[in-house]
A protein has these predicted regions:
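Aromatic-residue-lined binding/catalytic grooves and analogous aromatic/hydrophobic interfacial grooves
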Residues: 24-383
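Bacterial Sec-dependent signal peptides at the C-terminal "C-region" and cleavage site
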Residues: 3-7, 15-26
């Protein structure tokens, strides 16, 4: 290939520049026409500290909640200074092509000095494990029987807005739900609407598999607990606050649940924190809830959107006209037989989306499952790896 001169490069860039800058940016999204059937199909939202994954269920919906500091176990010294002595021999074996022998030497002498991660079962070991924060359960009650089918179902995730949604029609009413984890106010937010007055009835509760207590106080549901430190003592403490605001309708909170009846619009806010880095985590959780609770939903969304776009809009990738008239799962299946460059661009941007959603300044790095986990023992304890 001939070398291009600076002028030739400039002319070539001049031809492609209008294509890159003047074409309307496509709305990058994942979307589906059915609820998620397993956790891996849910849609990840996060701000680097908090995460949520809604499954978009129609009658019963579960949203998995996460906090990047929700770790069991305890600090331990895992240094192994003796390993250094075997490094020259390992290098020699590698240079001689004796990879298997080098690997065996690594296995034998390059183990950590502590007790290790309990072979990926570290929830109650000193190493610990990254665990889910909790499960948010929503039970919806419709004016027609719950057996009545639904139509026009869609759930999706906008990469450009870091906003997920679920919408469908049931009977004569159209319902819509929006979810996001605020980049600025550091809380998890959900908006539920019905297009007919007073047709929104639901119960919302929170729990987790173990180590938790729930109670209600002044209309707010609290979940608190403490994880195992792996040494027979109490470890990381945590607190979750759940609160609902309604523009109309009625609501009442009992020990672990908030009941909403005859509403048209409702807002669900979740604030959370742990003691891993902050001894005053209860005060912080309370303050975050108060600040967000005093803001209008539109203003919360606007601030979140602005902060998100500042990070996300730094990179564009245009590989041609996107074929997003098909749901994402159908595009993926068709991709095996038919080219779809737009899906490749979407995949690239989804990777960026996950990195931005899962990290933030002065927080933990992404672990094996990013910021998201749906059990108390994730894959290989959800360790960070290089």
């Amino acid at each position: 290939m001939k070398h291009m001169t600076f002028v030739q490069w400039a002319v070539w860039l001049g031809f492609i520049y209008p294509v890159c800058s003047c074409q309307p940016r496509p709305d990058l999204k994942l979307w589906y026409t059915r609820p998620a059937e397993r956790w891996e199909e849910t849609l990840p939202l996060g701000n680097g500290r908090l995460g949520m994954m809604p499954d978009g269920g129609v009658v019963q919906e579960t949203i998995v909640l996460n906090d990047i500091t929700m770790w069991s176990g305890s600090f331990q010294d895992t240094r192994n200074p003796e390993a250094l002595k075997y490094l020259p021999e390992i290098r020699r074996l590698l240079l001689e092509g004796k990879n298997d022998e080098a690997q065996e030497l690594m296995y034998k002498h390059f183990a950590c000095g502590g007790q290790g991660s309990a072979f990926g079962q570290g929830a109650n070991a000193p190493y610990g494990a990254f665990q889910l924060l909790g499960n948010l359960h929503l039970q919806y009650h419709f004016p027609d029987s719950s057996d009545v089918g639904y139509s026009a179902y869609e759930r999706g995730l906008s990469l450009d807005k870091a906003l997920a949604w679920t919408c469908f029609r049931k009977g004569k009413v159209k319902y819509r739900r929006e979810y996001f984890v605020s980049q600025t106010e550091d809380v998890m937010i959900m908006k539920l609407t019905a297009d007919r007055k007073g047709m929104l009835d639901f119960d919302v509760a929170i729990d987790r598999p173990e180590n938790y207590t729930c109670y209600a106080n002044d209309g707010v549901v609290y979940m608190e607990g403490q994880l195992d430190n792996g040494k027979g003592k109490a470890g990381t403490k945590y607190m979750v606050q759940l609160k609902v605001w309604t523009a109309d309708g009625r609501q009442v909170a009992d020990s672990a649940c908030i009941h909403v009846k005859e509403a048209t619009t409702a807002y669900v806010l979740v604030s959370a924190g742990t003691s891993l880095w902050a001894a005053d985590y209860p005060e912080r959780v309370e303050k975050l809830m108060q600040i967000a609770g005093n803001m209008d939903y539109g203003y919360l969304l606007e601030r979140h959107d602005s902060a998100w776009r500042y990070k996300y809009n730094r990179v564009e990738l245009d590989l041609g006209t996107p074929q997003d008239i098909l749901p994402t799962d159908q595009r993926l299946a068709r991709f095996q037989e038919q080219e779809d460059p737009g899906l490749v661009a979407l995949y690239f941007q989804y990777g960026r989306y996950l990195l931005i959603s899962g990290t933030r300044e002065n927080s933990f790095p992404l672990n094996l499952q990013g910021l998201w986990a749906n059990s108390e023992i994730g894959r290989a304890s959800c360790r960070e790896r290089v």
